[in-house]
Amino acid sequence: SFVLNEKVGPVSCTISQKGGAYKANFVLPKLPTFQAVEPDMDLLGRALGLARNQIGLPGHNCSVCDAGVPYPVVPLSGLKAMGDIKINAQALGSCMETIGRLAEVYVYTTECVWPDSDYHVRMFSPAFGITEDPATGSAAAAFTAHIMEIEKPKDGQQNYVIEQGLEMGRPSRIELKLEVGGGRLQQAEIGGQAVIVAEGHLRL
């Protein structure tokens, strides 16, 4: 175990090993916040390259969630909508400007590819030069606030699995552990395994 000193605060990290694979779990240094928002839906459709009926899920709102880094969160109708996304960066910037955010978006649906997943997500951030990210831990951390608001989980430990990066051919699995008490989030952890995608040496 060790602590990472990040801008958001000290992040406790625990490394474990099982079957030759290593797993890291991080405790969120601050509880995430949730703010329901209503972006311009016509602009949002243009930004995502989707029809209006592909955006949204019954009982799910658009939001901005923040666990140190704020993310606009948008529900989509299913896996087909997720696969149909064609980002228009200019329209995305105009759309997110209406809710005071930059050109980035974290989209999700409850229809999943893997049977043990709870959410299928994609993250686009042209504002920061990221066409698409295969695994976004900071967004998953923020998304715990959205889960609390939408699902209203019962007290105790609640576990969720997020799948991401499948459309990119770089699948990732992010695990969330929520400690709920009195109907409120008391603590949250994110975790997962990693594989080497690049390596090298620094000459000092």
Ranges and model annotations:
Residues 1-204:
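Active-site proximal loop and beta-alpha junction motif in alpha/beta enzyme cores
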